[in-house]
C-alpha cells in the first residue's frame, strides 16, 4: 500500500505537476510533504497527514514552513 501511494505521488510530480503553474503555499511542497509523511509514518497515517496538508493549501491560508511531524516513540 505504501509503495502504491509513493508511486502515485511520484507520477504526479513527474507528469502532472510540470504542466501546472506552481501554487503550493508551503515548504516543503505538498507532494514532497506527502512523500516524506508516507515514508516516515506509513501509508495510513502518512496518507492522513498528506490529506490534511492538501486541505490547508488554499489561497486563504498564509502557508509557510510546515515540516512533517516526527514519529512518536512508544515507551
UniProtKB/Swiss-Prot annotation:
GO terms for cellular component: plasma membrane. It is found in: Cell membrane. It is a peripheral membrane protein. InterPro entries: Membr_insert_effic_factor_YidD. Pfam families: YidD. SMART domains: Haemolytic (SM01234). NCBIfam families: membrane protein insertion efficiency factor YidD. Belongs to the UPF0161 family. Keywords: Cell membrane, Membrane. The keyword Membrane applies. Could be involved in insertion of integral membrane proteins into the membrane. This is Putative membrane protein insertion efficiency factor 2. It comes from Bacillus licheniformis (strain ATCC 14580 / DSM 13 / JCM 2505 / CCUG 7422 / NBRC 12200 / NCIMB 9375 / NCTC 10341 / NRRL NRS-1264 / Gibson 46).
